């Protein structure tokens, strides 16, 4: 019933044709927006209306024109007329017969016309015939009369339809050369359907359903001959007089302004139009019909009219005005006012081409004329304006000046295409940026793409006309390039000259280019040789060759030049030979960091310039080679005709530029286009390709501030199809979530700024129209709530509408597709939104048949529905629709839910196989399919059908496509997949969240892995830096479940590769079906959930899970699966290493599916398939090695013990090792990349020695057969080394050193790191933490016991390894545990996991426990802990319990005298932040009161164990509560001697002494410091410094303590003191009292300097003291130290000056002392040769240094020590150019006695510094670091008032302001501390005597 009602309404015309208001409410007629519910609608009864009119190409007039030309090519001949005649004048008369009101005629005349033609010609040659073009009409009579009136006898007539020529044959030589003739015809022609051109008819239907006809003409290129006999070629220009006899009820139009018609019998009218100017025949036009118009008169007084048919009047004004303004601006630009009195724009219901440029009467397809603001978007409006401006440009380029023949068609169409956008910028100046971007998008990019297609042809095309992308888009792009080369003004001057010269005639390319050459010459425009530019020569390779240049732009030098080269974009071997050999002279407009303003360059076609001096020639024609420091860009104006590809380094620099400073939209667009098209080029050539660079670029571009705030439609439109290609790969699979994440990554910021309303900015509004539907499809931002609310408002506004939604929708047309999409997608199942839209669609196709935009928006919106039921309705609509099936089914391609519904619908309706829509249907259904499962699904459908051959071919095509896409996804797309994981998904977490509902225990993993890194084993390029693997995990299920959740991250697999088996007692595998469609990844948790089919329950039993997958290797050092590169071997070649680190980041789940939590310990059976020339290492020893012939080898490893997944390790590479065996026979090896193993001997000894200690001390043998230490050339920045069980992996400098260059710090760092990781083999590997918040169970133990491992290995270093390290751990822990916002508990969920607390505070607390429990009890408790929890997991509670048992066994009591409970004791220390400060206060004169408070001043309290040292004893007491808990101990008389609480820094606390207690300690130190240990002395210095720094003490209280240092001889105290001395020397560097401070330092250290001098002895503590003393005394200008430095330096120069192997052997100076020697020796030298020597030696290290420590940094630092201003400036310039690293800035600054070298250099070189290849903050930090005077502060501020300051960008200004804050802070420090500090020095040391 509903269908009949709708059809009835259609026929009786109750709806107006084009309506903007609702029809009156009719009884019984339901409004489409009345309330309803989806569940009440019978889906099978829903019926549809279908539109009767829809343009085939609604948004692209050029496609319409191309379609027209293709149709015409079926009957057009290109046979040319002989050059016998010259056309002078035509008089034409036409009477058309077509249905019109009141007109009657014989039926046989219907859709014909009568015609009379009188043609005046001049004979150019003698002949026997007159030959003209004529086609498809009947000639009734003809006559030829010469100029004198003499009739020329015509003996016969010949009409050849093949050549479309008519010959009137007279006597021999009857046609006399030079004679003028009139040739007259009377004939009858055909009025064709609109598809056939000539005179054609079309029609429209009025609201009452009546059909109204109209006629018009379409003559281009060869159809004038269908209308009248003629010389129908462009070059035969003539004048035309046209008369039309037409139905009096109609309107007649032609090229010229109509005159008053003459009526005949009130039925017919006759009108004669004024004679035309000279013009080509194809431009003649007339039209007759019921036309109406809107008018506009422009500033040139030209009348422009927009014509339509009745009912369209209200939509024509925009066209009239736009046309008038385009005409005016074109007249202004060309300097030639439009020569006709009127310009008509006639819109027809049907027109084969989008538009036709007939002079004065342009005919269009209606949508380019009628602008309906209720349906049409901004993009539709601009498209109409563009088409009009295109056709109006033809009035000059094509009509006024016409191409001589169709080979130069670009002279018509190229100009029109160029000006259609260019001239709009003058019409709509506020939209200029948008329009210019459209020109690059729609002209340049389309032209470049067309020029490399298989059907490409030269721009000048003898086989023309070619109405295609070459002619239009390449032609327009040539003009854009010429404008850029000549300059806009010169180009305009040249175009004006061309038009003036060639007006009313015909032109070819030579005419244009020669005119431009003359103009260029008169304006002194030069070419690449510096000669006057010859435009003709320049353009020849562009117009006569296909293809375009590929410009390779190499900018990979640190400071060197960028270089260019060119080649044809396509392989030259596939191209037809040309005289230019596919080379071009390429104009480039470039900019770089040093030349930010664009400048012109040429990349010449060939070397050599004639008639020029050879030197000048070489200079002028050399390829561009500009200084390229950091970034450089070319084609800034996006005018170069070619594609530019940047090398990887240059590309990265451009990315950095875009991030920092942004670029214009056109450059963004061209960069994206060039990257994508280059990728396609490489793909076609079967070379490595990928989307990664494109994606990197897009990521940066779409997150720039400019795009975020003002999004560019053109940039988005360039990128979106590429993004869609990527989306297509993943939309239907397990990684479908990648697609919305990708769009959110790129566009979330832009979306957040969109207002969801029109802005009057076309760019933003068009972007909104195109982008927002994607935002809805991909759930960006608040689209769900917003679109649902907006559609609710639409529903409310249209509740009474009977005419659809266009007129009543309150929202912009730009937003409607998104609103409808959101309503369809997000509406709840009970909503009627979908059906409201469907009803609206049914009404819109009747209400607005010509304005299709609204009903198409409704269709596209409905395609977003996720409901199978409503999708089924939509599919039924589509399969019956009259619309283009590719368009409407194409909507469903973006909806992943649609494919299965399409499949099921086809299965239920197999008759669809006979539909003409079969191809489009299958295309949409399989568009996103790319899996083995989908291929089988499609084959199943195919096999159920009986197919014809054509149907079989269609199915076969899509089966092959699915198969190829599946293959592509798993091969070539691997790099893209890797990029998506790197950028869309969290790389890793430290730690990951716990995975809930893990019911598996005792996992046993079998991993077979192939590692694809460069080596002897071949693999496909797309497999590079990947691994392929199969993993089987056998496990015990402990509780019922219907799904398995396992950790897996960064792994690519097809769910169908997963197998699940039930393992029974007989070890038989029983397969368990898996629901592959519901296998789901959780990227944020790093898990995959595998459900059983039909939710089958898995009961407790043993199961195995098999997965085949591919994973990704980070190409830089990182956590997870990573790679290393190095240079090594005999040829110093690059090598690759595969390595793992699973403690942080991606975790082991990135290598294999596993239960990746520490508590899920399992065993691992690992087999690695790797290049044969490499070695594979893992946790266990290798047990089998199989070598294959193809360069690959399999290494199988023994099964591991039970261990946590994060300890699994692999290393593959070219390795060598040193080995030894421990006391118990453990094989110990240190591995390095080949050639470096010699430097690992020290680490090998530490490894073995630490194993021996751990085994012996804890009575727990190392359980593995071997322990390997792998020293890598690179390692993750997040860690130094990793304690994998049996295979320690870390950065090389932590395991190796070169003894010729290694300082004591270098050596001890190797010892400490190695021992630390070995200790982990017990604490972390054998016993493993239960969860990551207990990480101190690993790291605290390793940080504590490594000292004992070193001590066991090197007992002679006890003073350093034990004494110094124990103090240092406490020192660092206390330092950071009192910083708000930084400090956190040792046991904490607060990130980061790996911070100061678990390492240093954890170590300090273990030291505390060792002291409280006693070493023996602590040892016993830990041995028990290891034994009890070995191979399982432990918590802090387990540790405390083991220690408690040991403590109580030995009767250790707590603060209450009760058996000590370690947990109660340690919880406050491990679960709370900060530490206790015990403050001693003098009550009265003789009583000391102690109280406790937190360092961070909160209410936290601890039970503090304190060892108290007095002259006669060392006592132990507990301090509890606030006051200590025992007044006998803590409320005590003032001691007669000294009393040190916390002696030996045995507790984790600080003691704040009262003055009297403090000075008794100080007195003791002055009299006999050795009564206190070095640790105690260092602790006192550390505490005193802390109390002074925190404001609790006066500075002098701390300074008094330093007096005892005159006798100090231990490392820890000196390190504390010298850190303070160095700070003071730097603070006072520019204070006038600096000598006073220097004297203080020299006097305090005098005795120590005398004792230690410059003597090193191999004892680490001694050698560090020497280093510290030498450094600080040279800084303090100690004359003796400076003299020693000079002497050693002179010897050094003498010995090393000519060294060709570095300085390690020749120096003769201990590495600890080289930095001060080189620095202060060179500083005192007056010999410039010494500077040269140091500089040369530094340069040698830069060129030749390997991986290990060298003197390079020492020598570089020395260069900065010189005081020669010229040398300083030279070095600063070299830093800016990249010759020296920016670290030299710091050396120059700290050694600059004047303080202003960097500042003055900044004043003189501001721009260069800002452009330097390093961050501005480095310069500012170096410059201001020691400034502290009021003058310096004012000087720093003065720069802000200079003009140079304005050169800084916002970020740089902030950096500078931070620098001023530093100076201000330094100055404020002086205000507080300077006076008391100096007075104290004066008091104790007197005046300086240096």
Curated annotation (Swiss-Prot):
Disruption-associated phenotype: RNAi-mediated knockdown causes an expansion of the pachytene zone in the gonads of 31 percent of animals and a delay in oocyte nucleolus disassembly. Brood size is normal and embryos are viable.
Cofactor: Zn(2+)
GO biological process entries: embryo development ending in birth or egg hatching; oogenesis; peptide catabolic process; proteolysis; regulation of egg-laying behavior; regulation of meiotic cell cycle process involved in oocyte maturation
Superkingdom assignment: Eukaryota
Cofactor binding mode and count: Binds 1 zinc ion per subunit.
Hydrolase found in the keyword field: yes
Record: residues binding Zn(2+): 390, 394, 413, 1316, 1320, 1339
PROSITE patterns cross-referenced by the UniProt entry: ZINC_PROTEASE (PS00142)
Active site location: 391 (proton acceptor), 1317 (proton acceptor)
Name this protein carries in UniProt: Putative aminopeptidase-2
Annotated source species: Caenorhabditis elegans
């Amino acid at each position: 019933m509903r269908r009949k009602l709708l059809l009835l309404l259609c026929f009786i015309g109750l709806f107006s044709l084009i309506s903007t208001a609702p029809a009156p409410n009719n009884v019984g007629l339901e409004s489409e927006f009345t309330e309803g519910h989806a569940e009440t609608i019978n889906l099978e009864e829903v019926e549809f209306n279908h539109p009767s009119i829809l343009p085939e190409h609604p948004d692209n007039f050029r496609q319409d024109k191309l379609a027209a030309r293709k149709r015409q090519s079926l009957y057009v001949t290109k046979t040319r007329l002989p050059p016998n005649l010259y056309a002078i004048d035509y008089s034409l008369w036409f009477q058309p017969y077509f249905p019109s009101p009141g007109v009657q005629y014989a039926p046989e005349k219907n859709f014909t016309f009568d015609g009379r033609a009188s043609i005046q010609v001049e004979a150019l040659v003698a002949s026997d015939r007159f030959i003209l073009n004529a086609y498809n009409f009947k000639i009734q009579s003809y006559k030829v009369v010469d100029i004198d009136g003499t009739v020329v006898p015509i003996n016969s007539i010949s009409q050849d339809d093949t050549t479309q020529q008519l010959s009137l044959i007279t006597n021999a030589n009857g046609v006399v050369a030079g004679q003028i003739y009139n040739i007259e015809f009377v004939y009858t022609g055909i009025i064709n359907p609109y598809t056939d051109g000539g005179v054609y008819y079309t029609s429209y239907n009025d609201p009452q359903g009546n059909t109204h006809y109209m006629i018009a003409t379409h003559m281009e290129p060869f159809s004038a001959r269908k209308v009248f006999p003629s010389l129908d070629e462009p070059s035969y220009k003539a004048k035309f007089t046209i008369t039309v006899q037409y139905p009096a009820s109609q309107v007649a139009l032609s090229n010229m302004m109509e005159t008053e018609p003459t009526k005949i019998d009130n039925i017919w009218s006759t009108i004669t139009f004024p004679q035309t100017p000279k013009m080509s025949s194809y431009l003649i036009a007339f039209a007759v019909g019921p036309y109406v118009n809107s008018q506009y008169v422009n500033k040139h007084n030209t009348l422009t009219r927009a014509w339509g048919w009745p009912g369209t009047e209200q939509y024509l004004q925009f066209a009239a005005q736009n046309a008038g303004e385009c005409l005016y601006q074109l007249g202004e630009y060309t300097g030639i006012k439009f020569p006709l009195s009127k310009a008509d724009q006639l819109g027809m219901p049907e027109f084969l081409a989008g538009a036709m440029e007939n002079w004065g009467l342009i005919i269009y397809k209606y949508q380019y004329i009628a602008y309906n603001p209720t349906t049409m978007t901004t993009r539709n409006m601009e498209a109409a304006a563009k088409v009009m401006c295109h056709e109006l440009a033809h009035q000059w380029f094509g009509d006024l000046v016409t191409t001589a023949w169709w080979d130069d068609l670009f002279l018509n169409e190229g100009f029109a295409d160029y000006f259609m956008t260019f001239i709009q910028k003058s019409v709509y100046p506020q939209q200029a940026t948008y329009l210019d971007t459209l020109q690059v998008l729609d002209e340049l990019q389309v032209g470049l793409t067309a020029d490399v297609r298989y059907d490409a042809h030269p721009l000048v095309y003898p086989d023309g006309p070619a109405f295609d992308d070459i002619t239009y888009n390449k032609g327009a792009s040539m003009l854009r390039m010429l404008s850029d080369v000549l300059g806009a003004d010169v180009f305009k001057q040249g175009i004006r000259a061309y038009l003036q010269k060639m007006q009313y005639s015909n032109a070819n390319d030579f005419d244009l280019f020669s005119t431009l050459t003359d103009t260029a010459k008169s304006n002194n425009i030069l070419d690449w040789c510096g000669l006057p530019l010859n435009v003709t020569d320049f353009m020849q390779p562009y117009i006569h060759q296909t293809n375009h240049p590929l410009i390779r732009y190499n900018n990979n030098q640190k400071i060197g030049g960028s270089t260019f080269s060119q080649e044809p974009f396509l392989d030259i071997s596939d191209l037809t030979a040309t005289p230019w050999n596919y080379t071009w002279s390429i104009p480039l407009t470039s900019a770089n960091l040093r030349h930010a303003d664009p400048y012109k360059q040429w990349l010449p076609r060939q070397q050599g310039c004639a008639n020029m001096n050879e030197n000048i020639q070489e200079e002028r024609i050399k390829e561009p080679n500009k200084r390229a420091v950091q970034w450089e860009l070319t084609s800034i104006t996006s005018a170069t005709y070619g594609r530019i590809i940047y090398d990887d380094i240059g590309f990265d620099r451009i990315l950095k530029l875009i991030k920092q400073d942004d670029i214009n939209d056109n450059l963004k667009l061209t960069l994206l286009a060039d990257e994508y098209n280059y990728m396609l080029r490489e793909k076609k050539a079967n070379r490595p390709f990928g989307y990664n660079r494109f994606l990197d670029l897009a990521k940066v571009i779409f997150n720039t501030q400019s795009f975020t705030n003002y999004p560019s439609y053109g940039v988005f439109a360039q990128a979106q199809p590429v993004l869609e290609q990527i989306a297509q790969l993943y939309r239907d699979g397990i990684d479908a979530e990648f697609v919305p994440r990708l769009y959110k990554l790129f566009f979330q910021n832009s979306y957040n700024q969109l207002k969801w309303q029109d802005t009057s900015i076309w760019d933003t509004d068009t972007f909104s129209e195109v982008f927002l539907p994607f935002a809805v499809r991909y759930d960006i931002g608040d689209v769900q709530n917003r679109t649902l609310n907006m559609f609710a408002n639409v529903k409310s506004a249209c509740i009474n509408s009977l005419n659809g939604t266009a007129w009543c929708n309150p929202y912009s047309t730009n937003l409607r597709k998104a609103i409808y999409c959101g309503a369809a997608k997000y509406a709840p199942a009970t909503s009627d939104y979908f059906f409201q839209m469907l009803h609206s669609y049914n009404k819109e196709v009747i209400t607005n048949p010509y304005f299709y935009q609204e009903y198409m928006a409704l269709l596209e919106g409905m395609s977003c529905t996720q409901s199978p039921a409503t999708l089924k309705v939509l599919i039924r609509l589509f399969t019956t629709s009259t619309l283009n099936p590719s368009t409407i089914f194409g909507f469903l391609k973006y909806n992943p839910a649609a494919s299965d519904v399409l499949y099921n619908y086809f299965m239920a309706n197999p008759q669809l196989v006979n539909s003409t829509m079969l191809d489009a249907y299958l295309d949409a259904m399989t568009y996103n399919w790319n899996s083995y499962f989908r291929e089988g699904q499609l084959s199943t459908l195919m096999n159920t059908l009986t197919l014809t051959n054509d149907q079989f071919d269609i199915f076969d095509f899509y089966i092959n496509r699915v198969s190829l896409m599946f293959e592509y996804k798993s091969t070539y797309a691997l790099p893209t997949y890797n990029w998506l994981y790197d950028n869309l998904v969290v790389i890793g977490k430290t730690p990951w969240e716990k995975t809930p509902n893990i019911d598996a225990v005792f996992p046993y993993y079998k991993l077979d892995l192939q590692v694809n890194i460069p080596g002897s084993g071949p693999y496909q390029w797309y497999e590079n830096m990947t691994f392929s693997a199969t993993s089987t995990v056998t496990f015990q299920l402990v509780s019922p479940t219907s799904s398995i959740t396992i950790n897996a991250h960064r792994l690519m697999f097809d769910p169908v590769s997963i197998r699940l088996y039930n393992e029974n007692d007989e070890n038989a595998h029983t397969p368990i079906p898996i629901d592959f469609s519901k296998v789901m990844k959780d990227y944020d948790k790093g898990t995959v959930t595998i459900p059983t089919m039909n939710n089958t329950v898995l009961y407790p039993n043993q199961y195995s899970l098999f997965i085949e997958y591919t994973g990704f290797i980070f190409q830089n050092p990182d956590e997870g699966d990573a790679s290393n590169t190095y240079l090594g071997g005999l040829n110093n070649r690059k090598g690759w290493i595969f390595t793992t680190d699973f403690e942080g980041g991606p975790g082991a789940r990135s290598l294999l599916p596993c239960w990746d939590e520490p508590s899920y310990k399992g065993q691992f059976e690992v087999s690695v398939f790797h290049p044969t020339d490499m070695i594979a290492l893992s946790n266990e020893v290798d047990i089998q090695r199989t070598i294959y012939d193809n360069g690959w080898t399999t290494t199988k490893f023994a099964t591991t013990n039970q261990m946590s997944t994060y300890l699994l390790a692999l290393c593959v590479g070219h390795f060598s090792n040193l080995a030894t065996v421990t006391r118990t026979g453990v094989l110990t090896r240190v591995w390095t990349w080949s050639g470096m193993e010699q430097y690992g001997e020290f680490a090998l000894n530490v490894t073995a020695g630490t194993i021996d200690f751990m085994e012996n001390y804890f009575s727990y043998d190392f359980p593995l057969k071997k322990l390997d230490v792998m020293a890598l050339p690179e390692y993750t920045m997040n860690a130094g080394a990793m304690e994998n069980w049996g295979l320690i992996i870390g950065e090389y400098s932590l395991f190796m050193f070169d003894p010729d260059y290694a300082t004591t710090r270098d050596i001890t760092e190797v010892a400490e790191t190695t021992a630390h990781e070995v200790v982990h083999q017990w604490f972390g590997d054998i016993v493993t933490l239960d969860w990551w918040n207990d990480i101190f169970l690993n790291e605290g133990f390793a940080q504590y016991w490594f000292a004992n491992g070193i001590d066991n290995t090197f007992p002679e270093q006890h003073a350093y390894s034990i004494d110094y390290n124990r103090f240092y751990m406490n020192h660092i822990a206390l330092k950071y545990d009192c910083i708000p916002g930084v400090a956190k508990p040792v046991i904490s969920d607060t990130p980061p996991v790996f911070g100061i607390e678990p390492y240093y505070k954890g170590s300090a607390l273990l030291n505390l426990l060792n002291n409280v429990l006693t070493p023996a009890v602590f040892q016993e408790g830990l041995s028990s802990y290891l034994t009890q929890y070995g191979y399982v997991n432990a918590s802090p509670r387990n540790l405390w319990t083991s220690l408690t048992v040991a403590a109580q066994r030995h009767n250790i009591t707590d603060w209450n005298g009760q058996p000590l409970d370690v947990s109660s004791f340690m919880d406050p220390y491990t679960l709370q932040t900060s530490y206790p400060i015990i403050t001693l206060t003098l009550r009265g004169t003789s009583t000391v009161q102690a109280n406790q408070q937190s360092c961070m001043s909160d209410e936290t309290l601890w039970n503090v164990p304190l060892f108290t040292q007095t002259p006669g004893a060392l006592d132990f007491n507990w301090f509890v509560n606030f006051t200590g808990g025992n007044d006998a101990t803590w409320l005590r008389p003032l001691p007669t001697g000294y009393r040190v609480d916390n002696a030996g820094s045995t507790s984790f606390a600080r003691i704040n002494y009262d003055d009297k207690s403090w000075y008794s300690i100080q007195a003791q130190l002055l009299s006999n410091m050795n009564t206190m240990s070095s640790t105690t002395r260092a602790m006192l210095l550390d505490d005193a410094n802390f109390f002074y720094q925190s404001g609790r003490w006066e500075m002098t209280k701390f300074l008094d303590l330093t007096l005892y240092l005159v006798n100090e001889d231990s490392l820890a105290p000196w390190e504390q003191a010298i850190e303070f001395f160095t700070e003071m020397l730097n603070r006072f560097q520019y204070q006038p009292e600096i000598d006073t401070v220097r004297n203080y330092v020299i006097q305090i250290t005098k005795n120590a300097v005398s004792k230690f001098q410059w003597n090193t002895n191999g004892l680490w503590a001694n050698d560090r003291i020497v280093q510290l003393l030498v450094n600080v005394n040279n800084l303090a200008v100690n004359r003796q130290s400076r003299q020693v430095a000079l002497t050693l330096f002179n010897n050094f120069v003498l010995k090393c000056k000519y060294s060709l192997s570095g300085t390690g052997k020749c120096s003769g100076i201990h590495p600890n002392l080289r930095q001060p020697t080189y620095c202060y020796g060179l500083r005192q030298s007056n010999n410039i040769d010494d500077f040269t020597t140091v500089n040369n030696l530094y340069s040698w290290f830069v060129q030749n240094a390997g991986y290990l420590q060298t003197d390079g940094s020492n020598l570089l630092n020395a260069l900065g020590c010189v005081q020669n201003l010229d040398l300083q400036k030279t070095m600063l310039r070299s830093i800016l150019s990249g010759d020296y690293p920016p670290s030299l800035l710091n050396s120059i600054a700290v050694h600059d006695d004047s303080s202003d070298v960097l500042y003055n250099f900044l004043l003189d070189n501001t721009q260069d510094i800002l452009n330097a290849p390093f961050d501005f903050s480095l310069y500012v930090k170096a410059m201001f670091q020691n400034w502290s005077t009021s003058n310096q502060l004012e000087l720093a501020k003065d720069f802000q008032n200079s003009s140079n300051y304005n050169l800084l960008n916002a970020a740089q200004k902030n950096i500078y302001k931070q620098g001023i804050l530093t100076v201000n802070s330094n100055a404020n420090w002086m205000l507080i501390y300077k006076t008391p500090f100096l007075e104290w020095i004066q008091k104790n040391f007197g005046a300086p005597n240096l």
